[in-house]
Every structure is written in C-alpha cells, then in structure tokens.
Design a protein with these regions (language model features):
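Conserved alpha-helix/loop element of class I SAM-dependent methyltransferases that forms part
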Residues: 45-63
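Class I SAM-dependent methyltransferase SAM/SAH-binding core
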Residues: 66-70, 74-124
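A short SAM/SAH-binding and catalytic strip from SAM-dependent methyltransferases
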Residues: 133-146
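Conserved class I S-adenosyl-L-methionine
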Residues: 165-178
C-alpha cells in the first residue's frame, strides 16, 4: 500500500463522534475541556487511558521526558501524557481532519504549551537527531508500509538511552525490505 493511498483513505472517521459527544456534554462549541471529559472518546486504541498508564509506568515517563507520538489521531494519548506527567509531546498525525480536531481539543484543554501537533507523513518529516527520550505509538505503525525507513527514522531521533513503546498488530513472519 502506498502512503498516498493512506492519506486519502480516511482510515477512521471519529470526528463526528467527537463533536456529538461534546454536544452531549453541553460543551459543543466553546469553553474549557478537561482531559478526563475527552478520554472516553478520544483514545483510538484498545484499553483507553489504561494503556497509556501502563506505558507511563513501564518507561518512567515524567515531566523531563521529551516524547514523540507517531500516529496521534485525535491527540488523546498526547493530551493524557501531558496532563498526567507534565511531559512535552510532539504528536504526528497524517490525516488532516484528525490533526485539526486534535489541535482544537488540545487548545480547549489548555495543553497547547505542552503538546505540539504536526500534520504530516512521519517518513517525510525531519526531526532533530538524538532528541527524544521516548517514542510512542498506539495502533498506527501497521499503516506505515516502509518499516525499514520507519525504524531507521526512529533510531535517528531517539536518544541513545531512550525508549520506543509500541502497541500494534504484529505479523509472525520475517520482515522484508518494505
């Protein structure tokens, strides 16, 4: 599958659900939001915030951590990490509609000083070498067909003593060059 195809697929269309949930909360258009109010519908992976708490504990994520999330979706994990740990997060999302919603929700949670959202293809973006202490991804890497480039990019931007945490589908066969 080509990355261009992924960009046009609309892999997940949760945007309407988010705005419907906000209407149900009486917070459809304005005013502050809390991370807890969003966490039941902005986590696009299994086990919601429990999965993030597990990563926080395993990796000892704290306010000194510099985190990059690959495939950040609506920004739920990034906001939760920032709120719970005080860490700074760079959240990369390929789909523009998800990115736009993530930016909007992060601003409403007043976490835009802790979470930087970037819309783009992780394989094409440039990040500082040896910069991040933690890379995370929940159910996103299997959408990236060029795993060799993906992993090489991760190695380049991760500090030598850093951690790479992934929850994803796995294939039980050897990887090829793609």
């Amino acid at each position: 599958m080509q990355n261009d195809n992924i960009k046009s697929m609309k892999l997940y269309n949760f945007i309407d659900r988010v705005y419907n949930e906000l209407r149900e909360l009486g917070k459809a258009t304005s005013g502050p939001l809390s991370v807890n109010e969003l966490s039941s519908f902005d986590q696009l992976h299994y086990h919601g915030t429990q999965a993030i708490d597990f990563a926080i504990k395993k990796l000892n994520i704290n306010h000194k951590s510099k985190i990059l999330e690959i495939g950040s979706g609506l920004g739920g994990p990034a906001r939760y990490l920032a709120k719970k740990t005080g860490a700074n997060i760079t959240a990369v999302e390929l789909q523009e509609d998800h990115h736009d919603a993530a930016v909007y929700l992060t601003k409403r949670c007043n976490l835009d000083s802790k979470v930087e959202h970037i819309c783009g293809d992780f394989l094409q973006l440039e990040f500082p070498k040896n910069h991040y202490t933690v890379l995370v991804s929940w159910l996103a890497l299997y959408h990236i067909p060029n795993r060799k480039k993906l992993l090489n990019n991760c190695i380049d931007i991760l500090k030598p003593d850093g951690h790479f945490y992934v929850e994803d589908f796995a294939f039980f066969k050897p990887f090829d060059d793609n």
